[in-house]
Amino acid sequence: MVTILDTLKPGAAKPRHPEKAHRPDTPVLRKPEWIRVKAPGSAVYAETKQIVRENKLVTVCEEAGCPNIGECWTKKHATMMIMGDTCTRACSFCNVKTGLPAPLDVDEPENVANAVAKLGLRHVVITSVDRDDLADGGAAHFVEVIEAIRRRSPGTTIEILTPDFLRKDGALEKVVAARPDVFNHNLETVPRLYLNIRPGARYFHSLRLLQRVKEIDPTIFTKSGIMVGLGETREEVLQVMDDMRSAQIDFLTIGQYLQPTRKHAAIDRFVTPDEFKSYETIARSKGFLLVSASPLTRSSYHADEDFARLRDARSSALSRG
């Protein structure tokens, strides 16, 4: 019999990503000037953090190490991550922990609704970890959160950023029936890179999920995003745009991939601001209602302002016939 001893000292912090410990370290590139942001520290930032803590909430801003946390929290914009801080997937780009998640918190819907009210949000973004361990992938919990927010803050518009509900029959339909204002699901990268970057997901399943939202309820805005700088080609990015438009996706976001640790996927290159502008111009010409493309663009970055622009863009398109 062989006994394997735990070499961690009692009370020592365990590594955040033990599932990636076997991977060789990848090089970390120095960030260019256009990527760097100011460290957070304002009084409003501290107030936002306190409200999040008081309601025992998890935010993707913190868990994913978002570079925009200082700017967003200073505006009292925080993206709530429901169903815990532990994901059942192990995507090579993501900083969220992987493992066996805890049971769902039955108080979470009301806690989220309370935080939304205290922050005075006009528009809120709700995302989640993947919960492959749940029969419906967490769809019913999403619905409970949406309904709790609507009861407490009926004037607040709701944007959800969901997992793919892979092999969860009826889950998508359940969430769409709750009628969020925006349904976001990120494709994340080009199909060629899925096996390395997003191994637990399927590109065309994700694309079909977004198309299905429009089939069920055409009034719901659909949104999706990709990261660049992972080794994709320009032609592949343009093909993803075409795929998204064929699925009637309204809003496209494109941002620079930033490597959380040396155990995560390496940055292939930093895409320049001019290249992002070019992507935005091309995407607009393909018919998206709204496009956000910049090095620091993230799914929920400026979501409040973007939702207003999205509604205006739809109204303008309808008036043109």
From Swiss-Prot:
Cofactor-binding details, from the entry: Binds 2 [4Fe-4S] clusters per subunit. One cluster is coordinated with 3 cysteines and an exchangeable S-adenosyl-L-methionine.
Enzyme Commission number(s) of this protein: 2.8.1.8
What segment(s) does the record annotate as region Disordered? 1-26
Q: Which UniProt keywords apply?
A: 4Fe-4S, Cytoplasm, Iron, Iron-sulfur, Metal-binding, S-adenosyl-L-methionine, Transferase
Q: Which stretches does UniProt call biased (Basic and acidic residues)? A: 16-26
Q: Which GO terms describe its molecular function?
A: 4 iron, 4 sulfur cluster binding; lipoate synthase activity; metal ion binding
Residues noted as binding [4Fe-4S] cluster 1 in the record, renumbered to the chain: 61, 66, 72, 300
Enzyme class (EC, first level): transferase
May I have one GO cellular component term? cytoplasm
Binding, [4Fe-4S] cluster 2: 87, 91, 94
- Provide the Radical SAM core domain boundaries: 73-289
**Which pathway does UniProt place it in?**
Protein modification; protein lipoylation via endogenous pathway; protein N(6)-(lipoyl)lysine from octanoyl-[acyl-carrier-protein]: step 2/2
| Localisation | Cytoplasm
- Which is a Pfam family this sequence falls into? Radical_SAM
The record's catalysed reaction(s) read: [[Fe-S] cluster scaffold protein carrying a second [4Fe-4S](2+) cluster] + N(6)-octanoyl-L-lysyl-[protein] + 2 oxidized [2Fe-2S]-[ferredoxin] + 2 S-adenosyl-L-methionine + 4 H(+) = [[Fe-S] cluster scaffold protein] + N(6)-[(R)-dihydrolipoyl]-L-lysyl-[protein] + 4 Fe(3+) + 2 hydrogen sulfide + 2 5'-deoxyadenosine + 2 L-methionine + 2 reduced [2Fe-2S]-[ferredoxin]
Cofactor dependence = [4Fe-4S] cluster
Family that this chain belongs to: Belongs to the radical SAM superfamily. Lipoyl synthase family.
Report the protein name in the record. Answer: Lipoyl synthase
Originating species: Parvibaculum lavamentivorans (strain DS-1 / DSM 13023 / NCIMB 13966)
